Amino acid sequence: MNPQNVFLVGTRSLDEGEQALIEREQLSVYTMDMIHLKGIGFVAEDIKRKLKERKIRNVHFSIDVDSIDPRFAPGTGTRVCEGLMPDEFKDFVEHILSTNLIKSMDLVELNLCLDIIDYITARL
């Protein structure tokens, strides 16, 4: 996999190792600050544009539950405030799925044992 074809969306708390990897591999990062400034639609369209420019035809879409604000997705072991709102998350997923390029998906960082408030994480 070409690291330049990795897109991180909704980042807000990176450790030194993660930051070094991002810089070394030149990963595309869309922070929550950027999302608040430009909107999730801008981020989704920018990624779609890059996919088209790079002639990418097969995408693996990995959804990290801890990208969602823990008030709405407590079912994760890595809770960091100021994450994606449920509507932003759903809008982004719809944008990416609309490309018809998704060939595989996974869901990571989901811990249903911690999803103690009416299973709101699972219902997203």
Please identify what each model-predicted range represents.
Residues 21-23, 28-124:
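Catalytic cores of soluble, metal-dependent hydrolases
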Residues 1-16:
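Mid-sequence, gly/pro-rich, charge-dense loop/helix-turn segments that line enzyme active sites
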